[in-house]
């Protein structure tokens, strides 16, 4: 005979409750027609699990019910592999035995003891499911845990599953009956929580199963701005185009561009601006996106916003410009673009060498361009400010920098008739003579009758 008893099931489900005594029952049946069977039940984790009748006797063709108890715990005692109950049996011709008799019987190894069954202990319920979401990647544990959950349990598990970014768990909950249109105590849908994970697959799964948003609460574009995901933003517009506004504001009156600027996410700022986002918008503190980028020392964001907004000198509620905000925080690398750049251009225009050197010493970018692509060297050359030209060149100014129309500083000097400036530029390598914007007319042609320039040009060619 292979075994003396049979189990009702190969698994026993134990619905775990945090910090409570938990129990579950299972049944064994004696297969012997005329003889009683002694039964020994042991668990792989006796400090956690106990059985009400670890040693017992089952009469012929009878059944006995046993109860598995779990001690008070604040988290489910999951293990891989799972804990089990081992069922050992032995024939008992006398039909009766004391506990000590049974203990001696099973303590003595031999062919009289059968290993009839192994019953797997399965921890189930919403508490177990939530614990698995946070701590395990094992889908089998999760599907078993939710097998006894109510629809309400399943729906409440949707948020932690979405927050985990584990698309398989979200799929299992939806399949089992979880409501994708769950809303938390603040009225938020599952969409913002999916966005925060950065898992586009979870987001697509929710949308495909009918999850809707209320953007007056969800602020999905703001959420996407935080994680710097243009692909997520594009998907949101594809899915909820009639419900989204690129200039929508959150409770602080910040637009998605404000948030992107605060995080320094230039690619998203560019995208939002490209679809109509207002780079000049102000929030509840009258901060522009430029104020936010400056406060967080995001140079690339500051540079982009300076080129795509008109708020360089805008003042917030306390009267501070973006430069003053950056200055208070000690973000010295922003000083050049937010302030010294303008001062540098002005100094170059008026030939204020002292101011020029001060700006450069404070960190102004020597090749910083204005709205027309003119560098300080363009301005100094055009104005004939030879002292400024020399200082700028000494500090690394690009002699052949090209503006938006294709002009170099040498072109500017030539058009304005500043011979000495042109000579200085040529001496520093400024000899671009064939730019398309001039229809192949060299700026040197402007001075071709000037003997000193002609000699200088020939001399440079001779020693080249």
From Swiss-Prot:
Topology in the lipid bilayer is annotated as: Peripheral membrane protein
Q: Give yes or no: UniProt keyword Membrane.
A: yes
Presence of the UniProt keyword Nucleus in the record: yes
Listed SUPFAM superfamilies:
Ankyrin repeat, PapD-like
Query: Gene3D superfamilies this protein is in?
Result: Ankyrin repeat-containing domain, Immunoglobulins
> Where does it reside?
Cytoplasm; Nucleus; Cell membrane
Report each ANK repeat as a residue range.
Answer: 153-182, 186-215, 217-246, 252-281, 285-314, 318-347, 349-368, 372-401, 405-435
List the InterPro entries.
Answer: Ankyrin_rpt, Ankyrin_rpt-contain_sf, Ig-like_fold, MSP_dom, PapD-like_sf
Q: Which GO terms describe its cellular component?
A: cytoplasm; nucleus; plasma membrane
Tree of life domain? Eukaryota
A Pfam family in this protein?
Answer: Ank_2
The UniProt keywords, alphabetically, are: ANK repeat, Cell membrane, Cytoplasm, Membrane, Nucleus, Repeat
Q: Where is the MSP domain?
A: 3-124
The set of disulfide-linked cysteines is none
Q: In which tissues is it expressed?
A: Expressed in roots.
Which PROSITE patterns does UniProt cross-reference here? ANK_REP_REGION, ANK_REPEAT, MSP
Known role: May be involved in arbuscular mycorrhizal (AM) symbiosis with AM fungi and in nitrogen-fixing rhizobial bacteria symbiosis leading to the formation of root nodules.
Q: What is this protein called?
A: Protein VAPYRIN-LIKE
Q: Which organism is it from?
A: Medicago truncatula (Barrel medic)
């Amino acid at each position: 005979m292979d075994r003396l008893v049979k189990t009702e099931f190969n698994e026993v489900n134990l619905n775990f409750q945090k910090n409570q005594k938990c129990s579950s029952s299972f049944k064994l049946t004696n297969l012997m027609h005329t003889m009683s069977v002694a039964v020994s039940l042991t668990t792989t984790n006796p400090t956690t699990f106990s059985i009400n009748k670890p040693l017992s006797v089952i009469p012929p063709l009878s059944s006995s019910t046993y109860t598995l108890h779990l001690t008070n715990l604040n988290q489910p005692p999951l293990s891989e592999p799972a804990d089990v109950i081992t069922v050992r049996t032995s024939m008992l011709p006398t039909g009766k035995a004391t506990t000590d008799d049974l203990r001696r019987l099973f303590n003595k190894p031999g062919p009289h003891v059968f290993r009839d069954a192994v019953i797997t202990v399965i921890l189930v319920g919403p508490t177990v499911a939530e614990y698995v979401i946070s701590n395990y990647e094992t889908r089998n544990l999760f599907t078993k845990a939710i097998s006894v959950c109510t629809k309400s349990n399943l729906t409440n598990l949707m948020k932690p599953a979405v927050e985990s970014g584990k698309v398989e768990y979200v799929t299992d909950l939806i399949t089992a009956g979880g409501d994708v249109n769950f809303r938390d105590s603040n009225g938020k849908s599952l969409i913002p929580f999916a966005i925060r994970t950065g898992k586009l697959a979870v987001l697509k799964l929710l949308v495909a199963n009918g999850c809707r948003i209320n953007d007056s609460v969800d602020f999905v574009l703001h959420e996407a701005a935080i994680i710097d995901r243009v692909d997520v933003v594009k998907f949101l517009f594809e899915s909820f185009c009639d419900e989204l506004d690129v200039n929508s504001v959150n409770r602080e009156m910040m637009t998605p561009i404000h948030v992107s600027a605060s995080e320094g996410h230039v690619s998203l700022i560019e995208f939002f601006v490209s679809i109509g986002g207002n780079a000049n918008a102000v929030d509840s503190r009258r901060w522009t996106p430029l104020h936010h980028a400056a406060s967080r020392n995001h140079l690339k964001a500051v540079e982009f916003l300076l080129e795509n907004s008109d708020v360089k000198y805008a003042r917030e509620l306390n009267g501070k410009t973006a430069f003053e905000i950056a200055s208070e925080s000690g973000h010295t690398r922003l000083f050049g673009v937010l302030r010294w750049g303008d001062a540098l251009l002005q100094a170059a225009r008026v030939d204020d060498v002292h101011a020029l050197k001060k700006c450069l010493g404070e960190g102004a970018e020597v090749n910083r361009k204005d709205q027309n692509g003119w560098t300080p060297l363009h301005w100094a050359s055009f104005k004939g400010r030879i002292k400024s030209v020399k200082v700028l060149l000494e500090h690394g100014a690009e002699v052949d920098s090209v503006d938006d129309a294709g002009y170099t500083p040498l072109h500017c000097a030539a058009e304005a008739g500043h011979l000495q400036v042109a000579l200085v530029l040529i001496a520093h390598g400024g000899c671009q003579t064939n730019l398309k914007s001039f229809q192949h007319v060299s700026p040197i042609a402007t001075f071709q009758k000037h003997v000193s320039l002609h000699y200088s040009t020939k001399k440079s060619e001779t020693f080249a």
